[in-house]
Amino acid sequence: NILFATCLLGAFAFSSCEKNLYDESKQSEKEIKMTDLNIPEDFQWNLTQVTKGTTIANTQTKVSLFLDEKCSKDEKVATIPVYNKAINLPLSLPTYVKTIYAQYQSKSGKMITKSVAVNANGSYTLNIPDAIEANPTRAITRDNNKKDDDYNIEDDIKYDKERGVVYHPKKGWGTIMFEDQFPSLGDYDFNDFVANYQVLFEVSKAKEKDEYESKYIAIGLCLKAVGGVFPYNPYLRLKKIKNKNIESVMMSHYKTGEEIEVNLIDNKNPKGNLIIDCTPLVQNLDRRGSKYFNTERNALVTKEEDLPEIIIEIKLKEPKEIDDILEDDEFDLYLKRNDNGTEIHMNGIEPIAYQYPFNDKNLYPIYEDGEEEDDNYYYSNERLIWGLRVPGNVAHTIEKGDFLKAYKGFAKWAQSGGKNEQNWYNQGNADDNLLIHY
């Protein structure tokens, strides 16, 4: 787990204007609730997109890619070998990103930062004309007992010109937030279950294709809050990876390095997907006298280091092209209720063993089409959802906090079908009085 440990660490205010949600010039007559929002019928609630890009350089070299011009550590999305022929590189990027930044060493030895436009259709081309040749491969020795900021997987790949890493959603955390009252609508403070996530793919060029592929995947999960009272536990399904393709799965506590027994879910798993029981993330929580975890002002975690955190390492028998496993819905972190088996997934994802309430008139209709998976699971008739995935480390609301007041751009984003305010979670205008940052 040391291979990944140090890589891991390193919604909403909208005023009602009489009865017209979009007329901001009129005085507010009532407070808008989540259930008042006018959500477009085809809105998918996506905050990320998988881009289809190509990379090429004058010589084989190493390039790092970032979401920001400063090339901040937490905003890194990849460090990859680039060749003197075009190679396809898919990346999972926030929808607001129109430019990524490539950092590499030139022939003169200078570090160069180059901007790369991301087109409206998600395509981009990275062309490096003046890179220095990558260092030759040297033998790598891993010290599994070493846990400090000077050692991580990128220390290894720096000396191996054939290996790289791709992050999802980036080197810093993403955040998953749930409402837990499905199929009923909740209070929409989105703090019933909140966890940070980060996925790392160790990549190399495929032997017979101009693609990058991965045989090793590391996943970090950090519990931020449990503001629900129903007995739910978290599980992780990787939809494009089958149990039969697994060489090994390891789980450990990040802070202690203590190994955790892995429980893979085989029964009632007809598609044979890899499903990992992540219950250790929520065991033995210090709720500080509250019935919740880290959602009430008088019972908060006092420092970030007290948040439970686990690392999952997966080795595959055969590598997979990362294009197959980068999509958000292929990384299915979901909740399962202990007493009645209810599953809550992100919108559009079919449950595993739970009998979905197809006849519930409050839910969006599901239409089966042969073997095609319908994408209307876990939507209400009003197109509301029970799970939200954000490609950043976002704060969660206090118990009964108004998500729309906490994140002032959220309502506009949702009602525009994702066209406006795409970076609502990172605009600097959130109401910190309603938010808990760890």
Segment roles from a protein language model:
Residues 82-120, 124-133:
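Short Pro-Gly-centered beta-turn/loop motif in secreted/extracellular proteins
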Residues 48-75, 190, 231-233:
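Short, ordered, surface-exposed loop/turn motifs in non-cytosolic proteins
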Residues 13-39:
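Bacterial Sec-dependent N-terminal signal peptides
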Residues 1-15:
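Sec-dependent bacterial lipoprotein signal peptides
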Residues 71-98, 254-256, 261-266, 270:
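Tryptophan-paired
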Residues 279-438:
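A eukaryote-biased signal for long
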Residues 43, 129-185:
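Compositionally biased low-complexity segments at domain edges in trafficked proteins
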Residues 47-51, 215-219:
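Structural beta-strand segments of beta-rich domains
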